[in-house]
Amino acid sequence: MEPVQKLQIPYKSIRLSDGTEYQSYHTEGALSGKQPADYKNGIPAFRKEWIQKRFNHSNHSQMYFAKKGIITEEMRYAAFRENMEPEFVRSEIACGRAILPSNRNHPELEPMIIGKNFLVKINANIGNSTFSSSIEEEVEKLHWAIKWGADTVMDLSTGKNIHETREWILRNSPVPIGTVPIYQALEKVKGKTENLNIQIFLETLEEQAEQGVDYFTIHAGVLLRYIPLTTNRITGIVSRGGSILAKWCQAHHKENFLYTHFDEILKVMKKYGVSISLGDGLRPGSIADANDKAQFSELETLGELTQLAWKEDIQVMIEGPGHVPMNLIKENVDLQTKICQEAPFYTLGPIVTDIAPGYDHITSAIGAAMIGWYGTAMLCYVTPKEHLGLPNKEDVKQGVIAYKIAAHAADLAKGHPGAIDRDNLLSKARFEFRWEDQFSLSLDPETAKTFHDEMLPQDRMKTAHFCSMCGPHFCSMNLTQELRKFAQEKEIQES
């Protein structure tokens, strides 16, 4: 086994004033989340030698190697990041309970694993629209998202220069990149849904896979017979990909071509080692529509497609809702686990109430924490701009932070090894009034420090045994320390 130090596992070292050092899971890559001086230089091709060793294989999926009993360098790397044994990572990938997204043409990738027995991961969406954003802005959004902790990023560009934008996102990304290929396929037919066909879609898949995309969202579960089931919904079909395929099905009175040609899609996946994220094109777009027949009928089909992909050794994760009230969340996980035989669940939130536009990073983080606790492997973030507009940098940060909180809360509830260590260190620093250590251990040190310093900016206040909330005479922790000191002195005197 290759020594850990030679693998250069990307941890962030947090040194505390009491001499303690905490190693934090780190997603920022070689540039530590900073914007490159010139995005056209890209970042180092980290996996180049690993990929070359396996170049002659006909199947480049990590599941293919895992089923053969081979522990790849990527598996070993992901295992060390998780503090797990490499054999455990291999076995989880082999049985389909976890995926390691890693296109052979994305050598810049620092491998990570998605599965319910590992740390809960989060995805951030970026991408331009017809109204705004340049390539430079999207690369900047990428680095901004991973600076705050995004484990994967999806490029959902629908505007100009889709190919070139994706190319430079990939060349600058240390995290897996996902896309929804139907968007670019639609752009190729100038937005005319009825002109889509399997040839155009496969050409688009090949183009994106050749660039290095690590996972594709494929809405192959939107079947012709399911479309009428959405008629009485309040919000109908809210998935962009789902609505595109539904419109095509109705225009031609034919079955979804992604479903009927799924075997051809798998051939592209196998060639490049791309993972499939089976899209929930009929997910509920309002809590009134949650857990309805349309949603769960599609889920049954996704279970069928999962088996087809696994037969070809293709890695699969299943996308989920959406908008779901808290009392219906567990049913989603239980059904997905049963129908899709524990393939990793990847959910958008879910949003638990529809009354808070502008705050849906909060309404969804509540649902995300719950669904992560129940076993969801990856959470797709929601920003404050959800339902309102294209998110800017600050929106991306707020979304990522909200979801890092949700994911960590789920890890704590699941009892993931080591998850509580950071909480304990921060609590100890808080009780001992080590303010700088509190800032360093927080998910957002800049905001924590800013809030503290608003009222108490002086350097001497960095060691003060109070904050501006309670002042020097009403701090419960300071009073507790005095009580303990008094009790210890009394005990010494009596002994």
UniProtKB/Swiss-Prot annotation:
Gene Ontology cellular-component annotations: cytosol
GO MF term list: 4 iron, 4 sulfur cluster binding; carbon-carbon lyase activity; zinc ion binding
EC numbers for this chain: 4.1.99.17
Top-level class of the enzyme under EC nomenclature: lyase
Binding site residues for substrate: 125, 154, 183, 219, 239-241, 280-283, 319, 346
Reactions accelerated catalytically: 5-amino-1-(5-phospho-beta-D-ribosyl)imidazole + S-adenosyl-L-methionine = 4-amino-2-methyl-5-(phosphooxymethyl)pyrimidine + CO + 5'-deoxyadenosine + formate + L-methionine + 3 H(+)
HAMAP family: ThiC
Family as reported in the entry's similarity comment: Belongs to the ThiC family.
Record protein name field: Phosphomethylpyrimidine synthase
